[in-house]
Structure formats: C-alpha cells, structure tokens
C-alpha cells in the first residue's frame, strides 16, 4: 500500500496499531504509531528511511509492488534508530551496492545495529545537496541530538517538503495521513506527549536548529515526519509550537503525583490540591498516583506545569521505588524554570520526604518547604495539608499571568466539519452544594474529595437506603469518589 503525498512523492511506510511500548517500556503508546518511509521518483529514485525491523518483509513486498527495487538510485537514512533503519538489512540483501546517504555519526549507529561495514555509505553534512533531476535537489541539514547524535533532516527543493525525521512527529496511528484529516485534539495531545517525554532535554538544541533552518529562507509547504501524520495544512504551526515548548514552557498548572502504601499520602495529596484551589481557582491542578496512572501522561503534565508536588510514604527510610524512578526520569528530562515541593506520611521516620526534596533541588527545581504527616492524617493534619496547599498557591502565584503559556488543546484546522457549529468552551466548575442539597439537610461532606452524603438520597450502590442518617450508615461505608472511610467525613455546613 502506498499513499500519494505530493507530486512524485509517495508514503511507503507501515502502520502499527498494536504497539504499546517504545524505548523498551519507557514510553507508552496510547494511539499506536506509524513508521514513515517515503519514495521519491524524479529522474532519480530515492528512498527516505525504512521501517521498524519487525515489518521488514512487509515493507519490501510493498515496495516491490510499487517499483523494481533495482531502480532505487540511493537511500537516505535520516536517523539510524531501529524504528527508522530496521528494514535496511533485508533491503540491502536485495540491492547490496545501493549508496546510503547519512551523517558520519549514523554510520557508527547503522554498523552497530546491522553489522555491515561494507555497505556503500556516503556521508553528508549541513548544506550538502544531491541533484535528483527535474530541477530538484535534496538538501541535508544535520540535527544532532534531535534526538540522537546521528539525526538529520532532508529538504526537497521544488516541492518544498521537509523530511524532518523524529522532529515534529508523534506516536499516532490513523488511516488518514495528513494533519488536516485527523482529530485535532488527539493530534495536539500526542505531539505534546512526544515532545515532553522525548525532546525536552534537547530544548535548547530544538530552538537553535529551528532558527538555523529558518535562516535558510526555504519555503516549507509540507513537513513529512517519520512517525504519525504529515503536516500538509499550515505546516509551520508545529514549528511555532515547538519554539513555544522549547522556551521554558509552563502553563498556570500545578501537578501533584505520589505513591502511598496505606492511602495516607493520597489523603495529603487531595487536601493539598483543595488548598491550592481555595486560593487560586483559576490554576489547573492535576493529581496522579504513579502506581496506577500513565507515567508518560504524568511527565507531560509536569512539562506543562509551573510547579509540582511530589509525595511518598517512607519505606525503609527511603521513598517508594516508583517515586524514585519518576524523579530519575525527571532529572534526565532537565525541566527548566519550575518550582517543586515534597510531602508524605510516615510512621517511624520521614526520610522519604527529605530525599525527595534533595532530589528535586538537584534536578534544578526551585524547592519550597516540605510537609510531613505522621501516620494516618486526622482532622488536624488534613487541615494542615489544606493550609499547605493554600501557602503553595500563594507562593507560586504569578502576578502577570500573561507571562505564562496559554494551553492549546487542539491544532487549528482551516476546514470546519460541516453541520457542526463551534461551541463556547465549558468552564470546569463544581456544582454548588445549595444546588444539590437543601440548606437544612443533615449531610456529611468528605474532607478529601468534597463528595456529599445526603440522607435524602442514601447511597444505593452500597445498599444504604434513602432516609438513612449518618449515624446509621455502616462502618464499612466508603466514599464513592475517593474510596476512603467514614472518618474523613465532617458535618456539611451548607
């Protein structure tokens, strides 16, 4: 199967709907991915990149249905990682003398993976070009550490197509190839997830490389990535977004993540979140349990945030292993211009919180005062947690919010869907208690999640009938929202 991209350019890649892991198991793919390879047929026939090694035979069979493999004049490998050069060994068995154009660093990577130093390598550097006929040239631009030392981009004159490799891509699989054809919110989510988890450490290089490419004053009508969609409509929007993401990006957002042995640290996290909201309802607060939720989504939220709070129970005088792992990843991602604080519960010794604070400081975060709670937080401790959240909100408040990045939830499409009118965005609100409960009800409110128990409604999912007073609610009752017991409830002051 091939897809026409533009003029004499065709996509000859491979979709992978089922893949879930990338870089071992470090990156979770929620939307599959594609391995994009492109065939250019001018006076010379050029293949740009291959596909993952698992699809080598399918890739070659697909190519053979399109062209005689012997007609390929040369191959361009923009990046030697196996998801781009993986089918090279199988292909070179059929056309062993075909020149391979790549950076000098890529030769080491390709030989290291495929063990064929005898292949016909042709090294290129920024500004080098090859005439492929019909008045068109391929121009090469080295892009070291975006995201490997061997990375480069290739630009096709005449058609004004930039083959950008990993840059501007995303792990996103769809039968449709072009950006204007797919769900724009999904596309934005996957682009941000990809940048925040993979390219963040190289943000300074991203800015420098984009500025270098722009300095060439080359028109860009299309950006053909190595994963995900091809940017056809307004292709420079992703370039502009990358420049924003690379510039110490932060929204008016605070991310809290934690791990907990007995839900004690979770209770603290929820109360801290409520305290932040008390002081600044406009700030987006997200709470994650690292043992239960997607690590890469957490890291994407850290990337978006102006500050983070990291919580852990103390185990053997150190932090929980998953928190330690997250902090190691955060250190490697080298986030800039962000604030942080540690918190956690403990029984004998609160060593975890001290270690988290130290790790966050070492990772370059501006750290605030930590918070420890001994054993299970009681009412007094929960109030202290909430007050801590209030203090954090004040401490991390940004006076001029215009200096923060405006979150973009979707790329802009110039082609509206017929029959659907744009709606005003909904404002996230919590319904007022007065709207749901009468002022004289004998209600109880959960101090962790604010869920309200109303005797007039009962809780049928737990067998508690309408009219059951709080005193008669069984001790086994759990809050339907946060799954904590009766002891976290207080009288509702509606």
From Swiss-Prot:
Where found? Cytoplasm
Protein name, as recorded: Anaerobic nitric oxide reductase flavorubredoxin
Q: Any idea where the Flavodoxin-like domain is?
A: 254-393
Q: Native species of this protein?
A: Vibrio vulnificus (strain CMCP6)
Task: Name the PANTHER family for this protein.
Answer: ANAEROBIC NITRIC OXIDE REDUCTASE FLAVORUBREDOXIN
Phylogenetic lineage? Bacteria, Pseudomonadati, Pseudomonadota, Gammaproteobacteria, Vibrionales
Give the GO cellular component terms, alphabetically: cytoplasm
**Per the entry, which co-factors are needed?**
Fe cation; FMN
The positions annotated for binding Fe cation 1 are 79, 81, 147, 166
* Cofactor binding notes: Binds 3 Fe cations per monomer. Binds 1 FMN per monomer.
